[in-house]
Amino acid sequence: MAKEELIELNGIVDEVLPDSRYRVKLDNGIEVGAYASGRMRKHRIRILAGDRVTLEMSPYDLTKGRINFRHKDERSGPPSRPPQHRR
């Protein structure tokens, strides 16, 4: 299948399922099953419930998708560590 045939949609992760699968609610209100792309797994990009993502879907099966981008928001920065106490 050529890359031009894929449909790109945006959505929000509703639920994190076992085996690195996700349930995503698209902007048009439809819920689909999705998995993280190999590049996201390779770079250990963590996807949590509530994250805004972009996914690719095949026009032949609109119930499954591949997450290929996690959008940054105000809460996705690195966790702040408490200050170190020196003696």
UniProtKB/Swiss-Prot annotation:
Keywords: Cytoplasm, Initiation factor, Protein biosynthesis, RNA-binding, rRNA-binding
Subcellular localization: Cytoplasm
Domain S1-like, residue spans: 1-72
RNA-binding recorded as keyword: yes
GO MF annotations, alphabetized: ribosome binding; rRNA binding; translation initiation factor activity
GO cellular component, one term: cytosol
UniProt entry tagged with the keyword Protein biosynthesis: yes
Source species, domain of life: Bacteria
Cited NCBIfam families: infA (TIGR00008)
Alphabetical list of PANTHER family matching this protein: TRANSLATION INITIATION FACTOR IF-1, CHLOROPLASTIC
Complexes and interactors: Component of the 30S ribosomal translation pre-initiation complex which assembles on the 30S ribosome in the order IF-2 and IF-3, IF-1 and N-formylmethionyl-tRNA(fMet); mRNA recruitment can occur at any time during PIC assembly.
General function of this protein: One of the essential components for the initiation of protein synthesis. Stabilizes the binding of IF-2 and IF-3 on the 30S subunit to which N-formylmethionyl-tRNA(fMet) subsequently binds. Helps modulate mRNA selection, yielding the 30S pre-initiation complex (PIC). Upon addition of the 50S ribosomal subunit IF-1, IF-2 and IF-3 are released leaving the mature 70S translation initiation complex.
Similarity field: Belongs to the IF-1 family.
Protein name: Translation initiation factor IF-1 1
Lineage per the UniProt record: Bacteria, Pseudomonadati, Pseudomonadota, Betaproteobacteria, Burkholderiales
